[in-house]
């Protein structure tokens, strides 16, 4: 759904940038002239000059400087800061539109989570399995550490291995919201619980679909919370697997990748 979302930026409780002013800056950049830029933007020269003057006064850096020449007289040039403001404004406008699109595209997405929202409309990875969770515990060994993650369903817990350096850099302390990434080839599927118990993590579920290839099989598994887990296993390990079976997915702590907002 394409919505008209008008972005307004204020500094010191005064208007700094809006669609009209950004349009003016873009036309000045193209024409090299305040008067021509104002004409192309559909506003008067006085209004254009007043807007530029106010933006220059509010900002820590000058946005528009006088220059010789320019189409239509009144030569002007955008500073690097002015150019970056346009880029930032356009980027924020895109983010707003993508955030609004989430309302119609994904009804299940929690909108009270900044990490969930950002990852939904800006983060794309090759990992088929992605879950949101919260750090509940972390040991502090010297080199390799382990964190416990409670997933968004409030029941499922996973153990994840990290380096001590990564734990400190990402601030992976208790209460930190994280995104769990798990690639399909790193997941095993079995009906034998004893086999699954040898791994750090086990997730029970029901096989919902199997795509059999020449060398690999893609197994989709419905988890108790309604989410789908994807695993790719060698053909010889999938001969006994059938749709509708109760199985256990298993994987080790060092197969999991953690992403978060710092």
UniProtKB/Swiss-Prot annotation:
<feature type="region of interest" description="I">
    <location>
        <begin position="1"/>
        <end position="121"/>
    </location>
</feature>
<comment type="similarity">
    <text>Belongs to the ModE family.</text>
</comment>
<keyword id="KW-0010">Activator</keyword>
<keyword id="KW-0804">Transcription</keyword>
<dbReference type="InterPro" id="IPR005116">
    <property type="entry name" value="Transp-assoc_OB_typ1"/>
</dbReference>
<keyword id="KW-0678">Repressor</keyword>
<dbReference type="GO" id="GO:0000987">
    <property type="term" value="F:cis-regulatory region sequence-specific DNA binding"/>
</dbReference>
<keyword id="KW-0813">Transport</keyword>
<keyword id="KW-0805">Transcription regulation</keyword>
<dbReference type="InterPro" id="IPR051815">
    <property type="entry name" value="Molybdate_resp_trans_reg"/>
</dbReference>
<feature type="region of interest" description="Required for dimer formation and molybdate binding">
    <location>
        <begin position="125"/>
        <end position="133"/>
    </location>
</feature>
<keyword id="KW-0479">Metal-binding</keyword>
<dbReference type="GO" id="GO:0045892">
    <property type="term" value="P:negative regulation of DNA-templated transcription"/>
</dbReference>
<keyword id="KW-0500">Molybdenum</keyword>
<feature type="binding site">
    <location>
        <position position="163"/>
    </location>
    <ligand>
        <name>molybdate</name>
    </ligand>
</feature>
<dbReference type="GO" id="GO:0015689">
    <property type="term" value="P:molybdate ion transport"/>
</dbReference>
<keyword id="KW-0963">Cytoplasm</keyword>
<dbReference type="InterPro" id="IPR003725">
    <property type="entry name" value="ModE-bd_N"/>
</dbReference>
<feature type="DNA-binding region" description="H-T-H motif">
    <location>
        <begin position="33"/>
        <end position="79"/>
    </location>
</feature>
<dbReference type="GO" id="GO:0006355">
    <property type="term" value="P:regulation of DNA-templated transcription"/>
</dbReference>
<dbReference type="InterPro" id="IPR016462">
    <property type="entry name" value="ModE"/>
</dbReference>
<dbReference type="GO" id="GO:0030151">
    <property type="term" value="F:molybdenum ion binding"/>
</dbReference>
<dbReference type="GO" id="GO:2000143">
    <property type="term" value="P:negative regulation of DNA-templated transcription initiation"/>
</dbReference>
<feature type="binding site">
    <location>
        <position position="126"/>
    </location>
    <ligand>
        <name>molybdate</name>
    </ligand>
</feature>
<feature type="binding site">
    <location>
        <position position="128"/>
    </location>
    <ligand>
        <name>molybdate</name>
    </ligand>
</feature>
<dbReference type="InterPro" id="IPR036388">
    <property type="entry name" value="WH-like_DNA-bd_sf"/>
</dbReference>
<feature type="domain" description="Mop 1">
    <location>
        <begin position="124"/>
        <end position="191"/>
    </location>
</feature>
<feature type="binding site">
    <location>
        <position position="184"/>
    </location>
    <ligand>
        <name>molybdate</name>
    </ligand>
</feature>
<feature type="binding site">
    <location>
        <position position="166"/>
    </location>
    <ligand>
        <name>molybdate</name>
    </ligand>
</feature>
<dbReference type="GO" id="GO:1990198">
    <property type="term" value="C:ModE complex"/>
</dbReference>
<protein>
    <recommendedName>
        <fullName>DNA-binding transcriptional dual regulator ModE</fullName>
    </recommendedName>
</protein>
<comment type="subunit">
    <text>Homodimer.</text>
</comment>
<comment type="function">
    <text>Functions as an intracellular molybdate sensor. The ModE-Mo complex acts as a repressor of the modABC operon, which is involved in the transport of molybdate. Binds modA promoter DNA in the absence of molybdate, however molybdate binding confers increased DNA affinity. Binds the promoter of moaA activating its transcription; binding is not enhanced by molybdate. The protein dimer binds the consensus palindrome sequence 5'-TATAT-N7-TAYAT-3' and a variant 5'-TGTGT-N7-TGYGT-3'.</text>
</comment>
<dbReference type="GO" id="GO:0005829">
    <property type="term" value="C:cytosol"/>
</dbReference>
<feature type="domain" description="Mop 2">
    <location>
        <begin position="196"/>
        <end position="260"/>
    </location>
</feature>
<keyword id="KW-0677">Repeat</keyword>
<dbReference type="Pfam" id="PF03459">
    <property type="entry name" value="TOBE"/>
</dbReference>
<feature type="binding site">
    <location>
        <position position="183"/>
    </location>
    <ligand>
        <name>molybdate</name>
    </ligand>
</feature>
<dbReference type="GO" id="GO:0045893">
    <property type="term" value="P:positive regulation of DNA-templated transcription"/>
</dbReference>
<dbReference type="InterPro" id="IPR036390">
    <property type="entry name" value="WH_DNA-bd_sf"/>
</dbReference>
<dbReference type="InterPro" id="IPR008995">
    <property type="entry name" value="Mo/tungstate-bd_C_term_dom"/>
</dbReference>
<dbReference type="InterPro" id="IPR004606">
    <property type="entry name" value="Mop_domain"/>
</dbReference>
